[in-house]
Protein backbone atom coordinates (compact mmCIF):
# COMPACT_ATOMS: atom_id res chain seq x y z
CA UNK A 1 0.00 0.00 0.00
CA UNK A 2 1.46 3.33 -1.04
CA UNK A 3 1.60 6.50 1.07
CA UNK A 4 -1.10 8.25 -0.96
CA UNK A 5 -3.52 5.40 -0.38
CA UNK A 6 -2.72 5.26 3.35
CA UNK A 7 -3.40 8.97 3.69
CA UNK A 8 -6.63 8.68 1.68
CA UNK A 9 -7.90 5.83 3.86
CA UNK A 10 -7.23 7.86 7.01
CA UNK A 11 -8.93 10.97 5.60
CA UNK A 12 -11.86 8.93 4.33
CA UNK A 13 -12.29 7.35 7.75
CA UNK A 14 -12.32 10.79 9.42
CA UNK A 15 -14.80 12.08 6.82
CA UNK A 16 -17.21 9.20 7.35
CA UNK A 17 -16.90 9.13 11.16
CA UNK A 18 -17.62 12.85 11.44
CA UNK A 19 -20.32 12.72 8.75
CA UNK A 20 -18.45 15.21 6.60
CA UNK A 21 -17.74 17.93 9.14
CA UNK A 22 -15.96 21.04 7.76
CA UNK A 23 -12.51 20.08 9.10
CA UNK A 24 -12.57 16.68 7.40
CA UNK A 25 -13.79 18.24 4.15
CA UNK A 26 -11.03 20.87 4.25
CA UNK A 27 -8.45 18.13 4.83
CA UNK A 28 -9.76 16.23 1.80
CA UNK A 29 -9.62 19.36 -0.38
CA UNK A 30 -6.05 20.02 0.72
CA UNK A 31 -5.12 16.43 -0.10
CA UNK A 32 -6.92 16.72 -3.47
CA UNK A 33 -4.86 19.79 -4.36
CA UNK A 34 -1.65 18.01 -3.34
CA UNK A 35 -2.53 15.02 -5.54
CA UNK A 36 -3.43 17.26 -8.49
CA UNK A 37 0.11 18.69 -8.42
CA UNK A 38 1.72 15.25 -8.52
CA UNK A 39 2.69 13.45 -11.72
CA UNK A 40 2.89 10.09 -9.90
CA UNK A 41 0.56 7.42 -11.33
CA UNK A 42 -0.32 6.19 -7.83
CA UNK A 43 -1.30 9.73 -6.85
CA UNK A 44 -3.60 9.95 -9.87
CA UNK A 45 -5.25 6.64 -8.97
CA UNK A 46 -5.96 7.89 -5.44
CA UNK A 47 -7.14 11.22 -6.85
CA UNK A 48 -9.97 9.37 -8.63
CA UNK A 49 -11.13 8.11 -5.22
CA UNK A 50 -10.87 11.57 -3.67
CA UNK A 51 -12.88 13.11 -6.51
CA UNK A 52 -15.49 10.40 -6.10
CA UNK A 53 -15.74 10.90 -2.33
CA UNK A 54 -16.11 14.67 -2.76
CA UNK A 55 -18.77 14.11 -5.45
CA UNK A 56 -16.65 15.42 -8.31
CA UNK A 57 -18.06 12.60 -10.41
CA UNK A 58 -17.27 14.15 -13.79
CA UNK A 59 -13.64 14.82 -12.82
CA UNK A 60 -13.33 11.29 -11.42
CA UNK A 61 -14.71 9.82 -14.65
CA UNK A 62 -12.47 11.92 -16.90
CA UNK A 63 -9.34 11.13 -14.91
CA UNK A 64 -10.13 7.42 -14.76
CA UNK A 65 -10.64 7.46 -18.55
CA UNK A 66 -7.12 8.85 -18.91
CA UNK A 67 -5.30 6.57 -16.49
CA UNK A 68 -7.49 3.47 -16.14
CA UNK A 69 -6.58 0.05 -17.48
CA UNK A 70 -9.42 -0.71 -19.89
CA UNK A 71 -8.60 -4.41 -19.95
CA UNK A 72 -9.45 -4.63 -16.23
CA UNK A 73 -13.10 -5.54 -15.61
CA UNK A 74 -13.14 -3.73 -12.27
CA UNK A 75 -11.97 -0.51 -13.92
CA UNK A 76 -14.53 -0.87 -16.72
CA UNK A 77 -17.34 -1.36 -14.21
CA UNK A 78 -16.26 1.70 -12.24
CA UNK A 79 -16.04 3.72 -15.45
CA UNK A 80 -19.62 2.76 -16.23
CA UNK A 81 -20.87 3.82 -12.81
CA UNK A 82 -18.92 7.08 -12.86
CA UNK A 83 -20.11 7.82 -16.40
CA UNK A 84 -23.73 7.57 -15.26
CA UNK A 85 -23.06 9.88 -12.34
CA UNK A 86 -21.06 12.29 -14.51
CA UNK A 87 -23.87 12.56 -17.05
CA UNK A 88 -26.56 13.05 -14.42
CA UNK A 89 -24.68 15.04 -11.77
CA UNK A 90 -21.68 16.70 -13.32
CA UNK A 91 -19.45 18.15 -10.60
Which role fits each region the language model picked out?
Residues 3-10, 39-44, 74-75:
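Generic helix N-cap/helix-start motif at coil->alpha-helix transitions
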Residues 8-15, 48, 65:
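Conserved small-residue packing positions in alpha-helical repeats and bundles
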Residues 19, 42-43, 72-79, 90:
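Boundary/linker segments of alpha-helical solenoid repeat arrays
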Residues 19-29:
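Helix-turn-helix repeat elements of alpha-solenoid scaffolds
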Residues 61-71:
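TPR/TPR-like (Sel1-like) alpha-helical repeat modules
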Amino acid sequence: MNEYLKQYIELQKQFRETEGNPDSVRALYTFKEELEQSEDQQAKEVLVDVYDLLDFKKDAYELLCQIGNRSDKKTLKRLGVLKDYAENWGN
